[in-house]
Amino acid sequence: MTARQIVEMATGYCGVSNSELARRLGWSPQLLNKRLNTGKFTVEEWERIGEALGAVARVGFKFPDGTEI
């Protein structure tokens, strides 16, 4: 799943447009679209996107033995 797909699913679930998400992040809609096109976000940006949508972004690893980091 791409970053764009994840954000589109999350904004759709919340009923928030990309323009509104950009506003909540303090970004222009053009910057958000550029970032969605490249798929390049820092962990901190994922956390901010989650907060802007009233969610918690989780980034980590899950190993075959069930260990999560």
Question: Residues of each region from the PLM?
Answer:
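Short C-terminal boundary/hinge segments that cap the last helix of small helical domains
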Residues: G54-I69
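Short, basic-rich loop-to-helix N-cap that marks the start of a DNA-contacting helix
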Residues: T38-E51
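A short, Lys/Arg-rich alpha-helix, primarily the initiator
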Residues: M1-V16, E20, G60
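Recognition helix of helix-turn-helix/homeodomain-like DNA-binding domains
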Residues: G26-F41
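Residues within the alpha-helical elements of helix-turn-helix
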Residues: Y13, R24, A52
